[in-house]
């Protein structure tokens, strides 16, 4: 039997984390779930975030022999991890903005995240702990999250991304990608702010942690398993989404039927 890894996000940005884990554990069985009914998570209250993530993840854990859960969403990770860890008897891994590695290489840092992440005390505690003498500028953008989703189904977002990032022109030299959607906008960010800008995300570190918790054993056979993907509500972009997921070795989109309200 393969190890079953559940990756969860509000949208499809968590696929950036999936790619890193898949590289480390290519033969595991992957279940990807995203809560598109409540996308984007950056605009939800903490209580709603906890309720939705707990419900969806618990349902999938009852359907599959999940070995580990990865919350591939910075916004959710700052809120839901304690509740999930109390409820589940398997490891739950979250995403932390990569402030610490950024502070090791620069003192002109930009943290690009959702509005919710940049407002939370958790984020300021990270900065205080790991970058106390650095100039850390915060930019919270729901629009960039939406652009990443659009790009992943083939829509061009170059010029819009440049406008949203213009406040950082010549002000930062290192950017922490504090949302799992943003690795998909690396080219657009470099076009907007210059190719010399250093972009840092947490994907590789998460993959190493998952591998460690699974004792380095992603699978017990040499079979390549097709992943399964679930959304919380029907999507008008289903055809484009299925194309994206098929390229990443997932089956067709399945709907859990969990509306926003």
UniProtKB/Swiss-Prot annotation:
Residue sites binding substrate per the record: 9-10, 41-42, 74-75, 180-181
Pathway the protein acts in: Cell wall biogenesis; peptidoglycan biosynthesis
InterPro entries: Asp/Glu/hydantoin_racemase, Asp/Glu_race, Asp/Glu_racemase_AS_1, Asp/Glu_racemase_AS_2, Glu_race
Record bears the keyword Cell wall biogenesis/degradation: yes
Active-site annotation: 73, 179
Keyword annotations of the record: Cell shape, Cell wall biogenesis/degradation, Isomerase, Peptidoglycan synthesis
Biological-process GO terms, alphabetical: cell wall organization; peptidoglycan biosynthetic process; regulation of cell shape
GO MF term (any one): glutamate racemase activity
Catalytic activity: L-glutamate = D-glutamate
EC number: 5.1.1.3
Matching SUPFAM superfamilies: Aspartate/glutamate racemase
Known function: Provides the (R)-glutamate required for cell wall biosynthesis.
UniProt-listed HAMAP family: Glu_racemase
UniProt family annotation: Belongs to the aspartate/glutamate racemases family.
Record-given protein name: Glutamate racemase
